[in-house]
Amino acid sequence: MAQGISMLAIPWYFTAVIHRETLFGQAYFLITALSLFWGLYAGTLVDRYSRKKIFLVINIAGLFMLASVSISGFVNGSLPWYLVALVFGNTMFIYNIHFPNLYAFAQEITPRESYSRVTSLLEVQGQLTFAIAGGLAAILLKGVNSHFHFAGIDFNLPFSIRPWKIYEIFAVDASTYLIAFAIIYRISSLPVQAKNMNTSGLKERVKTGFSFLRRHRLIFIFGNASLAVFLTIITFGTYVQPVYVDAFLHRGGGTYAIGDMSFSIGALMAGFLTTRVFGEKSAIKGIIALSLIAAGMYLFMALNSLMLLFFFANFLIGACNAAIRIQRITYLFHHIPNHVIGRANSIFFVINVLFRVCLIGVLTLPLFHNGTNIIFALAILAAICSIGALVLLPQYKKLKLQPAVV
């Protein structure tokens, strides 16, 4: 929850509150570059230590950072931009170990025949909390007037809510980390398979992940190409979308946050329907088709400035991304052993981050911030989704017949 609120609120804060989107792009570029090193190390931690303890530690880290910065804001009445950027970096670093750890933990305690159901439930849970975070971000960023106009309809409410300061939002975020810590602390689980603790040095543990993927080339190709849509989602949600809403749609923070909510609702529906529609045997075909649909939606947004169409495109992209994630993780669960999955996922992550660094470096160029030129960034995102699908297409039959290794 805290990750979702921060990841939504901070980009909009830089874009529409202090009007320093170029500075945010540079900070985002630096944070992403630093996460290259963290990503590899995080994977070795996931495979070496108790995954429950890792969850507890990262929630304490998030609580400490958010509470400290929030207190500074309350004391001084404002926050310098670099402290806001620091919170964003901290949130990204937590995000980058949270999901590899979550999936490794899920595989560890789940019977093979339940992989698809569990990955769907994880996606539903994740997107539900993100949808709630989107709603909170919309309310906290923009506030709520007692009278407002939306989609051609006038609404009258018996109350109003003022827009919150960024440090007040951070205080809410800090409390969610504390709640998460309390819930996770009480979780008890029984692993389906004994965890093979690797106590070798860092270099040796990293090499093990590379060695596995070198021996399983198809898994390496699949693991990276199937992340193409995710690559665009992260870049679009944290950097391109705030500029697009502000410069192309000429709308405010409410539209930005509702767009994210639309994305989450689409993802939530995909969480319930993906396994029923595609099944485990059609995962590769589904990922290819959904990647192309996502590409089409980016082009759709580049060619239209209607707000409702923007929400619809976000809805479909969210559904495509969630369905791809479910099918991708289920496939990897069947083909990567639990004792190495943290490191394998960290390698996929680092490669994805490398592409993201290059992409952000391009999108921070002044060209994309002149007038409505941000639509060219959407065209680039569409091309990336299409390339991911085209890489998987020639490998379709081989991937479908790839034997399970666990």
Where is each model-derived feature located?
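Helix-loop boundary and gating motifs at the non-cytosolic
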Residues: 1-36, 215-263
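Substrate-agnostic recognition of the 12-TM MFS/MFS-like secondary transporter fold
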Residues: 1-7, 28-46, 50-62, 83-144, ...
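Transmembrane alpha-helix termini and helix-breaking/packing motifs in multi-pass membrane transporters
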Residues: 11-16, 70-75, 132-170, 358-378
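Cytoplasmic membrane-interface "Motif A"-like loop-to-helix N-cap segments
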Residues: 48-62, 278-291, 373
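C-terminal ends and interior cores of transmembrane alpha-helices
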Residues: 60-77, 292-305
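Helix-loop junctions on the cytosolic side of multi-pass membrane transporters
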Residues: 162-166, 170-200, 392-405
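Juxtamembrane intracellular "pre-TM" segments in multi-pass secondary transporters
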Residues: 189-224
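C-terminal transmembrane helical hairpin of 12-TM major facilitator-type secondary transporters
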Residues: 284-324
